[in-house]
Amino acid sequence: MGSIVQVRNLTLGEGLPKICIPLTDTDLHSLLRSAQTLLKSPCDLVEWRADFYADFRIKDTCLEALHALRQALGEIPLLFTIRTSEEGGQAVISPDEYEAINHFVIESGLADLVDVELSKGDEVMTRLCTAAHHSDTVKIVASKHDFSKTPPESEIVESLCKMQELGADIAKYAVMPNSEPDVLTLLSATIIMKEHHCKTPVITMSMGKLGAISRVCGSLSGSAVTFGTAGHASAPGQLPADILKTFLEHLQ
């Protein structure tokens, strides 16, 4: 595993940070309408936030939506995410059901990347990473989100390194700043990962208005992906994708 990950025609960890746009619709009609809309925006990959979707727990319904998204997006890579309530999402779900849904999505091959929360435990992470690696096509984005604070730099680095050690292809950490130094803490931790622990690409962000600068300076810090909007935001501080693209190009 290297610091560059290839997903379809997209290379993560190389060049400018890639722009990911989340879809947060609750039904298939709205989901596909939003997918068509984002095709008009600068978008390198798409995240389907399935936790917003009304019936994502029903296997056939979930796979139907994935099939439809896959057709609508063409070669744009698709990231499947169930964000749980513990990490700022909509899903109130048991660890067993969380793992089962992610597992059948991996087996389907319809998503190019699958988000797995580090908080679900080492065994869940390891099993899902193993399933993804056996598929030869699906990549795992290990993630951690703190909506109340920014942990110390060493703790951020430790968590990102743990994600790598458990087999994730990409390591992601999002934090909430309560002061300007908190934003610098997140950026410093990201630079440490880039310079000293570059086994995988990393994705980091400092959320909210205070942390917005972290979403446009990935070329400096080493964050491989930034999340933007073409409609509804899925997290505080996300910027419109066209504005993100302008900043990224001018700051490279």
Where are these regions (language model features)?
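Active-site beta->alpha loop and helix N-cap motifs at the rims of alpha/beta catalytic domains
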Residues: 2-5, 11-132, 139, 144-149
